[in-house]
Amino acid sequence: MVPTGFVWNSPTQIQINIPSYTNLTIDTTNISTDGLANYGFNYTDETGAPPAISSVAISSDGKGVLINLATAPSGRFGRVSYATVENPLQSGASVKPSGRTLGARGCVRSSSGITWVYDTSVTLYDWLPAFRINVF
């Protein structure tokens, strides 16, 4: 399950296409969103102040992610990244945070998984891996 491309649906909406055997979902139960903006998605470009992401949602067909920007980008070299930013270094800590609560992470996964054979109370999902994709 990796992004295969993107489409600009409007001057402020990017659709990242992600083929999956089941529909995509945003999981905020298994992944902590404390300190995590936009479910792990970021938008950057060459300007010093790229437009902020105003919302992130799963597309109506369940096979893509819709990223809405607050304003149309004015800079070149736009890029969407996912699961690449960790929480800031905690006060007094000497090691960057990691893991599903503080590390670089995202909340997108397949909507159905498989039951783990060694513990039938555990469901294993297909998680969207970290990526960066140029959108200009």
Model-derived features with residue positions:
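Short, compositionally biased P/S/T/A/G/V-rich stretches that sit at domain boundaries
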Residues: 1-9
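C-terminal beta-sandwich/jelly-roll accessory domains of carbohydrate-active enzymes
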Residues: 21-136
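Structural beta-strand segments of beta-rich domains
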Residues: 10-16, 65
